[in-house]
């Protein structure tokens, strides 16, 4: 008798990631104040775009809308977004505690801003732009190229 060992073959699928962060609602063609290195459009095509936080300067709805427009213009099959420390209205508890003092000088404080911000990132406009807002937890995706991605 002979033993037969079965090996599973793991497929290697080439996958391009585009990682950006700290855009602070500026498009790559704008140079944010104090910035020394800003990418230029068009950004390269990617299988996965991951925006790693600081979508805005202070978390206003107008800033989120500008960032969503930018993300919608990028050629990527999967566009993932996580909030950063500047995106204060996406953390409702923190916003209620600190938002008023942080947004006082802009006149941007609004009791309903956290709900409006969440609706923007979880609603139809984000879906139409191909953007998925990631909240805490584990998220799994199957990419168009067949690769599987798990974000924890």
Regions found by a protein language model. Name each.
Residues 1-78, 87-89:
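N-terminal active-site segment of His-dependent metallophosphoesterases
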Residues 7-17, 139-151:
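Beta-strand-turn-beta hairpins that frame and shape the catalytic cleft
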Residues 16, 59-61, 110-113, 128-130, ...:
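A short linear-motif detector with a strong N-terminal bias
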Residues 26, 61, 96, 139-140:
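A generic structural micro-environment signature
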Residues 39-53, 124-141, 149-152:
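Extended, compositionally biased low-complexity polar/Lys-Gly-rich tracts
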Residues 69, 73-139:
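Active-site neighborhood of divalent metal-dependent phosphoester bond hydrolases
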